[in-house]
Amino acid sequence: VIRIEKREGSEDRFVAPITETQDGALFMQMNRNKRGMTLNPMAPEGQEIVRKLVATADVVVANLPPQTLQSMNLDYDSLRAVKPDIILTTVSAYGRGGPYSDRVGFDGIGQVMCGSVYMTGEEAGPPYRAQVAWVDFGTALHCAFGTMMALEARRQTGKGQIVEGALL
């Protein structure tokens, strides 16, 4: 697994608690045993590096709005031109269609929009967000299952595909 971050690094590096290596503990947990690199996928040299990585990859996982992927030439059609049997797993807040498709989101927004915070907290008090990022983890789990099914389908057919996941 190779994690690609923006040039200045991902925000999750700095979420407390901070370890002795000055990285966030959650970042260290979620990225254990991954290789990592930073690049600018909007720049031609960054796009060339991504294309070289895609040519040797089985799966690309992208956590960006669909329009952002397209603007960086990382949409499914662009990746398939590099490697015809590639599997692209996309995770966005609201999916490819609909009025919110270009918006970003995270677990807290997903909890509010699905109504789960309405069912928490004290009866006379404000709602509470769950302390566990269950929307993020649930979305990741469904995307992982979908990706495994796509890998099996490719083994049987030789064809790649896109797997779409959304918080809602």
What are these regions (language model features)?
Residues G165-L168:
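A short, charged, Gly/Pro-tolerant segment at domain boundaries
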Residues V1-I162:
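N-terminal helix-loop segment corresponding to the beta1-alpha1 unit
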